[in-house]
């Protein structure tokens, strides 16, 4: 679960990490009022959406007067970043930055531990730094039995700050970030940039926290911060109906029984140059009601131009699945092409049933199904 920058900064402040003064606004007039209240010569207006790349998309602007504050706030509130509409902005006091750093804690599956990542090259282009100059990213695996005691925090801090005063401040921030990570079952805690101001203060100018969805039941306070996007609302609705659904950006809707087969289906589509619109595991039922609900879910996405149904019949027989599909599509009013691949128990009976129904195009292999979907 992701949260907004302003929410992450509230958590940072609670744990003693310095952040700049800021106000959340939902209108351009509110942004002007926040600018006046701050009494600062310059403020930064930031779009509050649950995605990265806000700066490059024009969602972060520096202003120094009320007219520009109003206009830029209005522009940002009217934009969409990576398909996400901007409904709120953060007006923050502009900080005189001497240097920018990158700091994060996340899970490293190679070391099977929490890993601390730091860089003296913080800012918007940290992804480019990681690609072009990976040696500039410092990594430390954290032993879960030791954690991050003072001596380790100071040792890691000295990697970026040679002077003891700054290293001491950095060590305290590292310990606070690690505490946030562990106490809240996070999967990512990130500061980019962590700014060294002209006055020598270390301050989190941006804040990002991602929480482990599977641990949210232990943190009702964290769950209360959830601000679902439209996609997440759809995914939650699918979960309530017994599906595993993840939205993607392609145009081939996928309906599959079994997570592994669903992943393999998506891989096959990508292998042949297509783009899946979703991951959708409907489970092992041949219940036509479930198929109807799954199709409604797929057809909500206007990008979907064809549906690929890939079913493996194990305990669930393919002829039962075919009957369920026929009953379901008798209720569905759509002329979208539907490719069906059945394999497993009674697969020949299932295919014969579907061939008698003009609604379906039949494939015998997963590769054939993927190619048919791509060409449709």
Swiss-Prot record:
Any Gene Ontology CC annotation: succinate-CoA ligase complex
Q: How is the cofactor bound?
A: Binds 1 Mg(2+) ion per subunit.
Q: Do you know which SUPFAM superfamilies this protein is assigned to?
A: Glutathione synthetase ATP-binding domain-like (SSF56059), Succinyl-CoA synthetase domains (SSF52210)
Which GO-annotated molecular functions does the record name?
A: ATP binding; magnesium ion binding; succinate-CoA ligase (ADP-forming) activity; succinate-CoA ligase (GDP-forming) activity
Q: Say which species the protein is native to.
A: Bacteroides thetaiotaomicron (strain ATCC 29148 / DSM 2079 / JCM 5827 / CCUG 10774 / NCTC 10582 / VPI-5482 / E50)
Q: Which reaction does it catalyse?
A: succinate + ATP + CoA = succinyl-CoA + ADP + phosphate; GTP + succinate + CoA = succinyl-CoA + GDP + phosphate
Residues binding substrate are 257, 314-316
Biological or metabolic pathway of the protein = Carbohydrate metabolism; tricarboxylic acid cycle; succinate from succinyl-CoA (ligase route): step 1/1
What protein name applies here?
Succinate--CoA ligase [ADP-forming] subunit beta
All residue ranges annotated as the ATP-grasp domain in the record: 9-237
- PANTHER family referenced in this protein's UniProt entry, alphabetically: SUCCINATE--COA LIGASE [GDP-FORMING] SUBUNIT BETA, MITOCHONDRIAL, SUCCINYL-COA SYNTHETASE BETA CHAIN
């Amino acid at each position: 679960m992701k949260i907004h920058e302003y929410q992450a900064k509230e958590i940072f402040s609670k744990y003693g990490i310095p952040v700049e003064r800021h106000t959340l606004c939902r209108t351009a007039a509110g942004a002007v009022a926040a600018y006046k209240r701050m009494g600062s010569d310059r403020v930064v207006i930031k779009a509050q959406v649950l995605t990265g790349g806000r700066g490059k998309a024009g969602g972060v602007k520096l202003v120094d007067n009320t007219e520009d504050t109003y206009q830029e706030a209005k522009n940002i509130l009217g934009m969409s970043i990576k398909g996400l509409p901007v409904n709120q902005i953060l007006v923050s006091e502009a900080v005189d930055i001497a240097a920018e750093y990158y700091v994060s804690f996340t899970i490293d599956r190679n070391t099977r531990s929490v890993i601390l990542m730091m860089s003296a090259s913080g800012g918007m282009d940290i992804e480019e730094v990681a690609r072009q100059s990976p040696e500039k990213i410092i990594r430390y695996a954290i032993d879960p039995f030791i954690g991050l005691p003072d001596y380790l925090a100071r040792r890691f801090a000295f990697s970026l700050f040679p002077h003891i005063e700054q290293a001491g401040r950095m060590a305290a921030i590292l310990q606070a970030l690690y505490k946030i990570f562990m106490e809240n079952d996070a999967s990512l805690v990130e500061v980019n940039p962590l700014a060294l101001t002209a006055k020598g203060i270390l301050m989190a100018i941006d804040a990002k926290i991602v929480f482990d969805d599977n641990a949210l039941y232990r943190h009702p306070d964290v769950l209360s911060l959830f601000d679902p996007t439209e996609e997440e609302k759809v995914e939650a609705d699918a979960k309530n109906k017994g599906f595993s659904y993840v939205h993607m950006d392609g145009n081939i809707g996928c309906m599959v029984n079994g997570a592994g087969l669903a992943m393999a289906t998506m891989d096959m589509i990508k292998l042949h140059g297509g783009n899946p619109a979703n991951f959708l595991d409907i489970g092992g039922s041949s219940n036509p009601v479930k198929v109807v609900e799954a199709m409604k879910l797929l057809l909500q996405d206007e990008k979907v131009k064809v549906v690929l149904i890939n079913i493996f019949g194990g305990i669930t027989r393919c002829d039962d699945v075919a009957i369920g599909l026929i009953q379901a599509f008798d209720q569905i009013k759509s002329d979208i092409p539907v490719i069906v691949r059945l394999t497993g128990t009674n697969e020949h009976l299932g295919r014969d049933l579907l061939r008698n129904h003009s609604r379906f195009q039949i494939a015998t292999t997963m590769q054939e199904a993927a190619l048919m979907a791509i060409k449709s």
